[in-house]
């Protein structure tokens, strides 16, 4: 088993809609492990979904990685995260326009023939709260075989450039059975093995799956320096129609 500790440094602003409140689209200071897996090139999927592919294919993409023994943890911020807010306005400048299917329509055919505009879900104006340049995050990559990881990746809706540095590498790190050990890093509760028992934790309800942090857990763990991470993590899959729920006692964050 190879374990890599990656330090990610943002060279450009990074935005993804963790939470939407009216016209404010917020980026939470955490990098989801699904997004990191795609960005690192470990799973490959088209950037845009076609009309036939109207849902993400997490199960199909990540089942291959589970079979290969590859797993990526969420990215935890190092230090206090820096955020900034920018305003955007995509309203048209034509004399006539109207709202239709959550989009601004200025097409003359729509105006004259009352044709139905294609449905869309792109906001026309609002504010974006983004991660600033210089933010740093740490994540861990597990693999049965050695991996060649890229030095630069693209993250977020606008594909912000991010530097990747492997700061530590372990081969067959030591493990032990812990009881009520504190894990400060972000974890995906769907990815924990059945041998890992959760106590309390901070819960973050983020799409596509919730994450937890500051968790107290018991079970087999890797000893990676002064960091402990659960043994046996693998990609779990959220149900398509029902909400996901974490295990254990939830503590307000």
Put a short name on every predicted segment.
Residues 2-12:
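Short amphipathic
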Residues 18, 50, 149-151:
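Short acidic, gly/pro-rich beta-turn/loop elements at beta-sheet edges
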Residues 14-20:
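Short N-terminal binding/cap micro-motifs at the start of the first secondary-structure element
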Residues 28-146:
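Extended, compositionally biased
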Residues 22-28:
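Short, polar loop/linker segments at the starts of domains and inter-domain junctions
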Residues 10-14, 143-145:
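Beta-strand elements of well-folded, non-transmembrane domains
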Residues 129, 134-253:
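Basic polyanion-binding and macromolecular-assembly surfaces
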Residues 20-22, 112-124, 241-244, 251-252:
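Short linear interaction motifs
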């Amino acid at each position: 088993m190879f374990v890599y500790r990656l330090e990610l440094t943002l060279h450009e602003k990074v935005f993804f809609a963790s939470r939407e409140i009216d016209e404010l689209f917020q980026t939470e200071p955490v990098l989801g492990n699904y997004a990191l897996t795609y960005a690192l090139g470990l799973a490959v999927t088209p950037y845009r979904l076609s009309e036939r592919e109207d849902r993400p294919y997490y199960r199909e993409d990540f089942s291959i990685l589970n079979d290969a023994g590859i797993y990526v943890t969420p990215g935890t911020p190092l230090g206090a995260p820096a955020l900034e807010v920018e305003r955007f306005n995509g309203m048209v400048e034509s004399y006539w326009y109207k709202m239709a299917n959550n989009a601004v329509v200025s097409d003359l055919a729509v105006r004259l023939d009352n044709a139905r505009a294609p449905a869309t879900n792109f906001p026309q104006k609002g504010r974006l709260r983004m991660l600033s340049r210089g933010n740093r995050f740490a994540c861990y990559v597990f693999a049965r075989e050695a991996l060649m990881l890229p030095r630069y990746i693209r993250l977020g809706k606008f594909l912000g450039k991010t530097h990747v540095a492997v700061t530590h590498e372990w081969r067959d790190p030591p493990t032990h059975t812990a009881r009520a050990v504190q894990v400060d890093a972000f974890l995906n509760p769907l990815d924990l093995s059945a041998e890992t028992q959760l106590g309390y934790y901070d819960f973050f309800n983020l799409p596509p799956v919730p994450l937890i942090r500051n968790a107290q857990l018991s079970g087999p763990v890797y000893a990676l320096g002064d960091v402990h991470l659960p043994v046996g993590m693998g990609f779990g899959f959220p149900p398509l129609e029902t909400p996901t729920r974490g295990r254990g006692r939830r503590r307000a964050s």
